[in-house]
């Protein structure tokens, strides 16, 4: 399964959308293994904060733009087909948002594109900082599986 499909499947499993892709209904409580953490959900997250353009545009592509409560870290302009929905989503920062800016939105889930943003030495925060506040974090598997981000390999 490609990374993009893996991420899409995980986000759909979290119940963030009601797209019909031939999948079975999501049942709660739900456990999702992600980059060394087990995330537990008693219900589908009502809102998501994204740290990274890739995760944001993936949610838009899945029809979940209305669930994105804030976004940050953009390297390029949004794709033209997502321009309208993106205009409705608050930009917390063009680069790395502050921990406080993310927490202030009270998200049900934070999705991060890179571990250096939300990870062991995250410039935004560690995953534990969010988890201590009962805010689950989902890290793109392509940035953690088989990779040691502390040494850049």
Name what the model sees in each region.
Residues 3, 12, 16, 20-57:
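Bacterial Sec-exported substrate-binding components of ABC uptake systems
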Residues 28-31, 38, 109, 125-153:
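Extracytoplasmic substrate-binding proteins
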Residues 47-120:
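A short, structured surface patch at a secondary-structure boundary
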């Amino acid at each position: 399964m490609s990374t993009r499909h893996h991420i899409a499947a995980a986000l759909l499993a979290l119940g963030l959308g009601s797209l019909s892709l031939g999948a079975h209904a999501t049942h709660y409580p739900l456990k999702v293994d992600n980059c060394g953490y087990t995330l537990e959900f008693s219900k589908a997250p009502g809102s998501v904060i994204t740290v990274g353009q890739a995760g944001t545009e993936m949610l838009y592509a899945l029809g979940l733009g209305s669930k994105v409560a804030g976004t940050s870290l953009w390297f390029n302009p949004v794709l033209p087909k997502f321009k309208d929905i993106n205009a409705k989503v608050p930009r917390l920062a063009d680069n790395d948002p502050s921990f406080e800016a993310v927490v202030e939105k009270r998200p049900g889930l934070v999705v991060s594109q890179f571990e250096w943003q939300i990870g062991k030495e995250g410039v935004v925060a560690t995953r534990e900082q969010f988890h201590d506040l009962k805010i689950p974090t989902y890290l793109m598997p392509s940035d953690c599986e088989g990779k040691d981000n502390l040494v850049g390999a």
